[in-house]
Amino acid sequence: MAKRIDVSGLHVYYGDFLAVEDVSMTIEPRSVTAFIGSSGCGKSTFLRTLNRMHEVTPGARVEGKVLLDDQDIYAPDVDPVEVRREVGMVFQRPNPFPTMSIYDNVIAGYKLNNRRLRKSEADEIVERSLRGANLWEEVKDRLDRPGASLSGGQQQRLCIARAIAVEPSVLLMDEPCSALDPISTLAIEDLISQLKENYTIVIVTHNMQQAARVSDVTAFFNLAGTGKPGKLIEIGETNKIFTKPEKKETENYITGRFG
């Protein structure tokens, strides 16, 4: 079931360095929110704070709040592993487990958490997840083949199937199409439009045309200056951001004057 994300006053630090400063936003359920901005502006760093993935980097910490349907994901009694089950992540490059079959890749989340599945239960999860990622018809007769044997676009859809297999509420996607060809990119974009019926989706993209095509809401990030932190400049309905932004900085980026 899709959930709402409320972020208030979020600062992200790496050691003493302030990487992202004072971000507040609401991300509505069953919608696609795109983060755009030039390289190094903090959009991917901020994305990782939404499921605590930034914590795998030594010295990373946050100040502020991230609420998932009113539950503070940074509360002392909250397990980061549970947060990452609830808020899944799809990375820039397809990363199926190379030694695992397509079948085992899909249920990897259950195995990593030492959850035993009956064969019938595992079969149901695999088919449901692969259908959800629009991949079932292409691989149903070769589920025992390595995940790495698939094409790049298929591998990325396999990674999406793996993410939705554990039934998250939110899917984070960090430039999921940047390593893919145009046909595979179109397949992923079509899939995103379908997935938003059941999930809250947040996507980082360098491709403004992609943001315009797939998202309902767009957030523009930019650096406050050389050596300064990234900041949220403007967030709003995608059509408005691309046709009538409120901030001059946003307009300059959208029209290609910088970035």
Curated annotation (Swiss-Prot):
One of its GO terms (biological process) is phosphate ion transmembrane transport. GO terms for cellular component: plasma membrane. ATP binds at G37, S38, S39, G40, C41, G42, K43, S44. Its EC number is 7.3.2.1. InterPro entries: AAA+_ATPase (IPR003593), ABC_transporter-like_ATP-bd (IPR003439), ABC_transporter-like_CS (IPR017871), P-loop_NTPase (IPR027417), PstB-like (IPR005670). Its main location: membrane. It catalyses: phosphate(out) + ATP + H2O = ADP + 2 phosphate(in) + H(+). It is found in: Cell membrane. Keywords: ATP-binding, Cell membrane, Membrane, Nucleotide-binding, Phosphate transport, Translocase, Transport. It is a peripheral membrane protein. The keyword ATP-binding applies. It comes from the Bacteria. Pfam families: ABC_tran. GO terms for molecular function: ATP binding; ATP hydrolysis activity; ATPase-coupled phosphate ion transmembrane transporter activity. Residues 5-248 form the ABC transporter domain. Belongs to the ABC transporter superfamily. Phosphate importer (TC 3.A.1.7) family. Part of the ABC transporter complex PstSACB involved in phosphate import. Responsible for energy coupling to the transport system. PANTHER family: ABC TRANSPORTER I FAMILY MEMBER 17. The complex is composed of two ATP-binding proteins (PstB), two transmembrane proteins (PstC and PstA) and a solute-binding protein (PstS). This is Phosphate import ATP-binding protein PstB. It comes from Thermobifida fusca (strain YX).
